[in-house]
Amino acid sequence: MKIRYILFLLTVAFLLGSCATPKVAYFTDLKRGTAEQVLNPLEIRVRPEDKISILVNSKDPLLMNLFNLPIISRQIGTTSGTSNSQGISGYTINKDGDIDFPVLGHIHVAGMTREEIASYIKEELVSKNLVKDPVVTVEFMNLTVSVLGEVANPGRFNIDKDKLTLLDALSMAGDLTVYGKRENVLVQREENGKKTLYQVNLNSGYDLYASPVYYLQQNDIVYVEPNSMKARQATVNGNNVRSASFWMSLASLLTTITVL
C-alpha cells in the first residue's frame, strides 16, 4: 500500500513538472501607473564601416548637385524579367572614422549621431559661404541588429531611427514565442574589439530599464533562449512526453499501481 502511494505521488509530480506553465508576462514587478527612469538613453553613433547617406537641400539646384552624390540606378531581377531601381549613393566611414565629403574634404564623423553630423556639415557650409540656406539630412544605410532564437520571425533588421530599444527589436521580430525564456534574454555587443554578453530579465522592468543594453547599438545580436518546455521537446525523452507510446506507458504504470 505504501509503495503504491509513493509511486502515485511520483507520477503526479512528474506530470505537474512536465506541464509547468512558463512565465510569459513582462514587467511583473512594476506597479501600474508608476513611472520608472530609464538609464543610459543612448543614441546610435556611427562607427567605421557604417554607411550613411547625406543629402543637402538648397533653393539653388546647382548647389544641390555640387554637394550631393549621384543617384545610382540598379537592375533588379524579377520573375517577369528585370526592373530598374534608383537609390542614393552613400558614404562608407573608413577605418579612421572619416568620410570624404564634396568640397569640404575629409570629415571625422565616427562617434557622432545623425543630428550631430547634419549640424556640423550645415555649419561648415554656412561658415565657408558655400551655401546660405542648407538643409542637411543624414540617414543610416547599412546599420542592423539581429534577433535569434525563440521569436516569431528571427532575422536581421535595419536601424532607421536614432534610438532603438531591446523591446523595439523584439517587436520587429514578432515578439517572443511561448517557448522563449523571458528571464534570460542575451545580448551580444562588440566593444573595443571584444564581444561582451549581457543578460536581461524581461519579467523584471527594473532589470530591463537599468540594463546597459536596453538601448541597442548597431551589430548587436539578441538571442532568446528556449525555456525548459522547449528544451524537453528538443530531446528524445522530451519528445516522448507528447507521443502516444509515452501515454500508453504511463497508463500501464497507473494500472500497475492500482493493482498493487
Where are the regions that the model predicts?
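Ser/Thr/Pro/Gly-biased, low-complexity, turn-/loop-rich segments
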Residues: K2-I3, C19-L260
